[in-house]
């Protein structure tokens, strides 16, 4: 793997000193960026077609480079690996799964696949990003956690309007849920290791529904999948666990991830005292970046740095940029992060 010129993020990941806290944002390439919206409009295709097109995905992934972020995350969807498994979602605008998971037979019908054969576009995106960047910035890969994917597969669409139904299914159909999560765990390990082999300098696992998962379900189903995944990943690339607004820091610390990406419910100062060697990512409120004034954003960033002491810290949001976020607020976030993130 080539030498990275802007190595701040990689240095933090390897517990090395930096001149300032690195910054990037979840969903940094997307609907808050007018250039993305224009590109998507000009392209005219559905999202799944764009995700499968390495040339366009590379172009979109690189858009945030112009605002000064310290890492590029590939433009892709957490549902991508479900297509070769026989559970592909249609984006119309979607996502829609024709047959939501309801039976053990459906779980057993999921197809094992080789990412090198069936997800060549993902490898092409990661390799293409490294070729375009020429070592300028590190490239991040990612995957949805088994439970995040299970939420979509059980709901058959975006689960946000069906949370209670999905949780009821998990509690009532424990054997189906267990089998589904076991299959998804093995698939996710292969998928993330494939990304690492394709050039990802670090990978992030998205536990996207951690904020609505009851503690007992988290302990029974979520925690074991995280531990299995992180223990099976290639050690050449650090790993990040994102748990959306989960207060269960004790469980997160047992996951085996190199970095914990935490929400507003976690104060970084006591979190660092609890685990001094852990690297934390986050955790500026995305609603402040979306709806606040520039001064509000500045103060939120300063507060975050005061909590972390600018040590073992990657500045990010509590979760992804909201669609309504003004692009000038995104630019201000990065500018102020670089200004106040200096390590003295």
Locations of regions flagged by a protein language model:
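Active-site-proximal loop/short-helix segments
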Residues: 79-89, 142-168, 194-221
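Catalytic-face loop-and-helix region of soluble metabolic enzyme cores
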Residues: 231-344
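Active-site-proximal, glycine-rich beta->alpha crossover segments in alpha/beta enzymes
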Residues: 90-191
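N-terminal basic, low-complexity leaders that serve as flexible interaction/assembly modules and, when applicable
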Residues: 1-87, 91, 227-228, 327-344
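Alpha/beta enzyme core
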Residues: 157-203, 215, 223, 227-235, ...
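Active-site mouth loops of central-metabolism enzymes
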Residues: 42-57, 163-190, 286-296
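Hydrophobic faces of well-ordered beta-strands that scaffold small-molecule active sites
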Residues: 19-27, 72-74, 139-143, 203-205, ...
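Alpha-helix-loop-beta-strand connector modules within alpha/beta enzyme cores
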Residues: 120-137, 215-237, 274-278, 333-342
């Amino acid at each position: 793997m080539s030498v990275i010129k802007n190595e701040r993020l990689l240095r933090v990941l390897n517990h090395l000193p930096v001149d300032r806290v690195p910054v990037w944002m979840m969903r940094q390439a997307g609907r808050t960026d007018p250039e993305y919206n224009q590109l998507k409009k000009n392209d005219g295709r559905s999202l799944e077609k764009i995700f499968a097109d390495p040339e366009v995905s590379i172009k979109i992934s690189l858009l945030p480079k112009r605002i000064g972020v310290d890492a590029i995350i590939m433009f892709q969807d957490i549902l991508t690996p479900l297509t070769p498994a026989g559970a592909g979602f249609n984006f119309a605008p979607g996502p829609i799964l024709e047959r939501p998971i309801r039976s053990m037979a459906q779980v057993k019908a999921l197809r094992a696949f080789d990412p090198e054969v069936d997800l060549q576009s993902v490898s092409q995106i990661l390799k293409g990003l490294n070729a375009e960047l020429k070592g300028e910035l590190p490239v991040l890969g990612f995957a949805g956690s088994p439970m995040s994917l299970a939420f979509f597969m059980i709901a058959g669409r975006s689960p946000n309007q069906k949370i209670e139904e999905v949780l009821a299914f998990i509690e009532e159909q424990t054997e189906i849920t267990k089998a589904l999560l076991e299959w998804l765990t093995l698939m996710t390990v292969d998928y993330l290791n494939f990304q690492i082999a394709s050039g990802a300098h670090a990978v992030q696992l998205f536990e996207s529904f951690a904020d609505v998962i009851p503690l007992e379900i988290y302990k029974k189903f979520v925690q074991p999948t995280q531990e299995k995944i992180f223990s099976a990943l290639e050690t050449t690339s650090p790993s990040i666990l994102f748990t959306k607004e989960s207060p269960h820091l004790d469980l997160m610390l047992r996951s085996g991830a190199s970095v914990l990406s935490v929400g507003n419910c976690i104060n970084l100062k006591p979190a660092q005292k609890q685990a001094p060697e852990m690297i934390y990512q986050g955790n500026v409120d995305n609603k402040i970046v979306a709806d606040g004034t520039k001064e509000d954003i500045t103060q939120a960033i300063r507060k975050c740095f005061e909590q972390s002491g600018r040590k073992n810290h990657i500045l990010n949001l509590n979760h992804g940029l909201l669609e309504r976020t003004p692009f000038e607020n995104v630019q201000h976030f990065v500018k102020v992060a670089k200004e106040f993130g200096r390590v003295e």
